[in-house]
Amino acid sequence: MSVFTHLSLSPINIAAVLCLTKAYNTAYAKGEQMINETMFARGAESSIIREIFSYGLERKAQIGAENVFDFSLGNPSVPAPAAVAESIKKALELPSDQLHGYTPAPGLPQCRVAVAESLNRRFGTSYEGKDVFMTVGAAASLTCTLNAVTNPGDEVIVIAPYFPEYRVWIEKAGCTCVEAPADEGTFQLSVGNVLKAITDKTAAVIIDSPNNPTGAVYTRDTLMRLANVLREVNAKRDPENPIMLISDEPYREIVYGAEVPWVPSIYENTVVCYSYSKSLSLPGERVGWILVPNTNPQAARLMPAVAGAARTLGFVCAPALFQRVIIDCIDEPSDVEAYARNRTALTDALAEYGYTYVEPDGAFYLWVKALEPDANAFCERAKKYELLAVPSDSFGMPGWFRLGYCVSYETIINSLPAWKQLADEYR
């Protein structure tokens, strides 16, 4: 019996299979690659952040972890709250189909309600569970949102410097990433530069406050001026096609006294993307959410679009176990004091050694001016002292580097002599 008989293929289908096989073999013989070249390029050119992190792991294996000062990755060293472990223990008593089974695509109803009620307590809002879509972390939140609010050929504005993966996700949605430089004195969002970047093709603006990589927290005044500019632009557009503001907020709870305004209360056409990677120190568990506020005029159409994007991109549901953890731990505080201590130790020393940096009001990153114009060359030289920093070019701004001070306090202190030696080379 032939394989075609076994598969019960008709003669027409057999001919089609043979034709496709012949075409593939011809292409293979010519050396043509039957793969997606864009995806190949993305995989071959890995994230510079991950590249440096991998290099750090190699060096730690070679010379000992205590001798490598890796500031590359935003990987919290602060432990998850004790309540997380207790919640996991409790969940392990559940029947297997509840613990490990699928949840509804938008998330467990009780988890969505817990998120909405937490936001209502904090911001005086009136959200419901149906306004929340649970996701596999902030990356999934952003990719789903971008695919929901844009069409191929649209433009999405980012504030430079910006998290490098924004460009990847924007371009995957078939859109063009347009950079609007921040104010280089304060690294506040520059409303004027955003206005200059807006065209008829602009579909969305992404903001990230507290900001990665600068640590800047956008003020209420800045956000109100941005909202007014967007409304002025929207007034000249089809009412069904306003510019959407995507507020990426994984660092919301990690602030040092600054106010982090609730963006949907300032601009109505806002979608919020969130992750528990930083606030609960759960970066590897991949759980977060999208909020489509019920005050957003496009909400009735936008939430189904988010669901459709998640389905199309292959996100079946957020992890069942950690949705249950979120229900129990949603209002657990972040250990901001640990990050504040790291920040003080690092900034005090770098200032003494002659480095220039942006005073961070939030997140756990320090944005430092390189001691030579080429930040890549500077970061390569830093490796001589086992100092691993991320050059700024991939963030859309040359001449700086990013340090993630979410490492242990011991790493900060032990790295300081190396930072001084490096600075001395440039004197």
Residues of each region from the PLM?
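Conserved core of the PLP fold type I
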Residues: 96-240, 252-266, 271
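Conserved core segment of the aminotransferase class I/II
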Residues: 268-340
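Alpha-helix termini
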Residues: 58-64, 122-124, 229-242, 294-300, ...
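PLP-dependent enzyme catalytic core of the Aspartate aminotransferase-like
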Residues: 24-27, 121, 195, 331, ...
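Conserved glycine-rich beta-strand-loop-beta hairpin in the small C-terminal domain of fold type I
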Residues: 320-327, 339-351, 357-369
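Short, Lys/Arg-enriched N-terminal segments with co-localized hydrophobic residues
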Residues: 12-33
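N-terminal small-domain helix-loop-helix segment of the aminotransferase-like
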Residues: 35-137, 144, 322, 329-336, ...
